Structures are given as structure tokens and as C-alpha cells.
């Protein structure tokens, strides 16, 4: 029996719409992500589900993304003339759906990594990542890797999608604390994409390029202040903030508390705030608990970058 954990991820990081993503893990050691267990059985295929958010999963197994991952993986095995083994997959759904924390990516990554290890790794990392992107595209309507790549590989990933590489890891600031606040409401990726304009002004395009280029440069040259300053979003946040509860007010409040940068995690409704030290992270977390959470399903975690990505649990 094998258990694979895939961590939460925050896509875009404000400055890199559909091109940047970071894997995160709580500093208290709790697992913020999904777990998929795989084991051999006598015949056929079985899919079971458990976990706090299991009630949010589709009632029909065929609509479960883990089932779709199994089907896609099996199709790729057949193309290599490899025998399909009888097995059972169990998804522990610990991530809220439509949270902006890469919930679907967690399930996809955990399932495909479990299957690849179960079959003695017939597929390379890039081949597996390509499958992950295809499955993610079925949910959001377009193939993008800014959740699955960091969830799978860890760290901060920049999507390059050229010269045989889907992504490359950016050097980052491990001393930063990431405060993630999920308000307990759901925003679908499709809904969050539909609210965006079909075109942007020349000035917005120039600003976006300047911010992203400067951010990547700052990461490579270890300029924390410049990197944090450039974490600005002219592509999505001005339009998506309407989907989030009192976002502008909360963003200003955590800035006043001393955070370096804040924004929408993925397509929302989770927001992130980056703190330079634990004291400011703790103050920000307390504020967000009291002012951003909307119900009992909401939560706040103080995290750091997860540089490992998907991994087996002992």
C-alpha cells in the first residue's frame, strides 16, 4: 500500500497570471493537501473517497477527477503495451473545492504520482506533468500548469513551455511566511475566468511585462524588496476582487500590519499575504480570521514554500 500527499498551491502569485505558481505547506506540520492511497486488489478497479470535503465531490464516480486520472494513465500504459493491474484508489479529499488553492491539482497530482510509482515509474516527470495539465484543462476549460507544476515538483515554478520544458523552478525567499486565508465560500475557476476582459490596454500589457520581468530578475538576484514590490496584478485582481468578500479593505489592513505583498490565490476566494517574519504573519493571520472568514468552513494557515512537492507518506 502506498500513500501519496500532494500539497496546496497558490497560482499566479499576483504578478504571473497563468505563468507562476508556488507550493505551500503549513509551518505547524499539518497536511494542507490531498492524499491518494493505492493498493493492489484481486480484480478490476475500485475508487473510494474519504476526507473532510468528501461531500463536495461528484456523486458519479466517472466525474471524479481521480477516476479520470486513472483512465488517462491506463490509456497511456496501453500505448506502451503495458499490462493494466487490478487496483484500488482511495482519495482523501482534504482540500476545499473552488478555493484557489489548487484543489483539483492536489487530487490529480496525488493520483498520477501514486499510479506512476505503483507501476514502477514508466513515465518521466515531464510526461507525467503533461498528463496533469491535460486533466486540469478538463476542469478549467484550458490547459495550464501553474497549480499542477508546483504541487508536483515543489517550490516556485515558472511556466516556460518551450524547448522540451514545461516549467523551471525559480530561486525564492525561504524566509518569507505565506498567510493563506480561505473565507469558506466557493469561486469556480470557470466563473473567475469568465469575469476577465477579452482584451487589455497597451498600458496594462506593458505594466504586466515590467512587473513579471522585474520579479523574475529580483528572484535570481536575491532582491527581496524589489520582488515583493513587483507582486502586482493588473490582469485579474481588478476584476476578480468583486467575487471576494471586502477584499480591498482587507488587503489594505494587512498592508498596514506590515505584510510585504498580498493578493488573490489562484482564481480565489483564498487570499495570500506575505510576511517578513513570524510576528507579522501571526498578526495578519489573526486579523484575517476575524475579518475575512465568512463561515465555519473557512480557515487561515501560516505557511512556507514547500520545496518538496508530491511525496509518499510513511
Swiss-Prot record:
ATP binds at residues 96-106. GO terms for biological process: threonine biosynthetic process. Pathway: Amino-acid biosynthesis; L-threonine biosynthesis; L-threonine from L-aspartate: step 4/5. One of its GO terms (cellular component) is cytoplasm. It holds the Pfam family GHMP_kinases_N. Keywords: Amino-acid biosynthesis, ATP-binding, Cytoplasm, Kinase, Nucleotide-binding, Threonine biosynthesis, Transferase. InterPro entries: GHMP_kinase_C_dom, GHMP_kinase_C_sf, GHMP_kinase_N_dom, GHMP_knse_ATP-bd_CS, Homoserine_kinase, Ribosomal_Su5_D2-typ_SF, Ribsml_uS5_D2-typ_fold_subgr. Its EC number is 2.7.1.39. Its main location: cytoplasm. PROSITE patterns: GHMP_KINASES_ATP. It catalyses: L-homoserine + ATP = O-phospho-L-homoserine + ADP + H(+). It is found in: Cytoplasm. It is an enzyme of class 2 (transferase). GO terms for molecular function: ATP binding; homoserine kinase activity. NCBIfam families: PRK01212.1-4, thrB. Catalyzes the ATP-dependent phosphorylation of L-homoserine to L-homoserine phosphate. Belongs to the GHMP kinase family. Homoserine kinase subfamily. This is Homoserine kinase. It comes from Histophilus somni (strain 129Pt). The gene is thrB.
